[in-house]
Amino acid sequence: ITSAKGYDAEATLSPDGKKMIYCSDKSGDLELYVMDLKSGKEMRVTNELGYDGGAWFSPDGNKIVWRASRPKTPEAIKEYKELLAEGLVEPTDMELYICNADGSDLRQLTDLGNANWSPFFHPLGKKILFSSNFEAERGFPFNLYLIDIDGKNLERVTHSETFDAFPVFSNDGKYLAFSSNRNNGGGRDTNLFIAEWKD
């Protein structure tokens, strides 16, 4: 599908299977692109310095949510560019962003600090589940949180002392699958879990 040198990754498909959104450094920065899979035509979604990745379409295909870093200070910008030149990023300070599928109405969804990432739409399309360590004093643990698409009504979902991330709903909204290193006997194993979801 892509053949450019560099980083083309983190791809997900629209619900109708006609489009793909992915992260690429083809511009010299890590930006999001939407590709029509039939024609191969692309649209660049993001245009601001920082890492934009991990994007998902809403269930109706009309919106996109993703994680992004936005280095602001001269020191942070310098560090980001130096790491990027080596093909690296430091994903420690990220917020969630949302926009329409055509790139319009782009806005920041969270302003929590630390790392807010792995967002996924609830099947009704009105809420987003994501992983965050914003309540952690030392960067750990990560728990799952739910937030409305307008940035209101933040709610904590899991209460783990380890790592919960990569949430995915079943299409009917009855089940939630996620990755966690809970119940691993103190080791570093990360396993998959599934839970019944009740609104």
Predicted regions and their residues:
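Hydrophobic beta-strand positions that form the internal "hydrophobic ladder"
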Residues: 20-21, 64, 128-129, 176
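Short loop/turn segments that connect beta-strands within beta-propeller blades
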Residues: 36-40, 100-104, 148-152, 197-199
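A structural motif specific to WD40 beta-propellers
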Residues: 43, 106-107, 154-155
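A flexible loop/linker signature enriched in serine peptidases of the S9 family
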Residues: 2-8, 23-33, 46-51, 67-95, ...
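Residue-level detector of Asp-centered blade-edge/turn motifs that repeat once per structural unit
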Residues: 15-16, 59-60, 123-124, 171-172
